[in-house]
């Protein structure tokens, strides 16, 4: 009697050997629920929707046996690592601009996509993401006695600069609360140099005028939040 691996069809004499056996096909099946793998799977589906017009018949089994599996999983894990603020939009941008799959994990591509996305994204999305980021930061830093309300006032300036330059904190928030404005005024020249390209004051001040209702809505929420 032999025992057969249902993933690679290899046969074993002992059931215990089959149990500890880990072929590539089995490994891919076992990691199917990992966040990075799922993001890679979604990107794979979107790739086929964009290039072939439909991916209705594409299953995880199709993905796991695809020659593109490793490339898309690498990309999915990259999205997790960089904390991509909108994985679907970024994937669509890569496809629309015909970026080679082998290059999808390059930081330069994300940096190229991000500024335009921050200008186009829904105001509510920017606000919700920022408030969550502030709350997460406050949860990890109990020394902030007033929680996320102290984010701009007493948070680590370099960390906040990083949050702004990676899109975690949008100009919608920085420019529309007292804490954000005070934070910008207190930056040193090096920090200002990093932040400035991401907050583009001329552009955003005009946008706030063009979308006055959204601006007043954001200001009201941030004021009530104590920021």
Predicted segments with their positions:
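Charged/polar, solvent-exposed surface patches and flexible loops
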Residues: 20, 24, 39, 46, ...
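Long, mid-chain structured domain cores
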Residues: 108-176, 181
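Charged, amphipathic alpha-helical linkers/stalks
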Residues: 29-74
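C-terminal recognition-helix end and immediately following basic linker
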Residues: 1-41
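Extended alpha-helical scaffolding regions
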Residues: 60-137
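Surface-exposed polar/charged interaction patches
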Residues: 47-54, 78, 82-85, 96, ...
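Charge-dense, extended regions
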Residues: 148-227
């Amino acid at each position: 009697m032999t025992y057969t691996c249902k993933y690679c069809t290899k046969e074993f004499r002992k059931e215990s050997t089959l149990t500890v056996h880990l072929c590539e096909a089995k490994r891919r099946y076992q990691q199917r629920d990992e966040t990075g793998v799922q993001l890679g799977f979604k990107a794979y589906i979107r790739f086929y929707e964009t290039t072939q017009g439909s991916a209705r018949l594409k299953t995880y089994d199709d993905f796991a046996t695809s020659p593109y599996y490793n490339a898309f999983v690498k990309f999915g894990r990259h999205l997790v690592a960089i904390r991509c603020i909108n994985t679907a939009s970024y994937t669509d941008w890569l496809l629309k601009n015909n970026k080679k799959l082998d290059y999808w994990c390059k930081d330069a591509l994300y940096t190229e996509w991000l500024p335009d996305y921050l200008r186009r994204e829904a105001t509510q999305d920017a606000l919700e993401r920022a408030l969550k980021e502030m709350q997460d930061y406050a949860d990890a830093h109990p020394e902030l006695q007033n929680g996320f309300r102290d984010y701009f006032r007493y948070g680590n300036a370099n960390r906040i600069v990083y949050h702004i330059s990676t899109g975690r904190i949008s100009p919608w928030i920085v420019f529309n609360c007292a804490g954000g404005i005070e934070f910008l005024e207190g930056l040193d020249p090096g920090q200002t140099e990093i932040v400035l390209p991401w907050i583009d004051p001329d552009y955003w001040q005009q946008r706030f005028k063009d979308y006055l209702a959204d601006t007043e809505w954001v200001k009201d929420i941030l004021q009530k939040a104590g920021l």
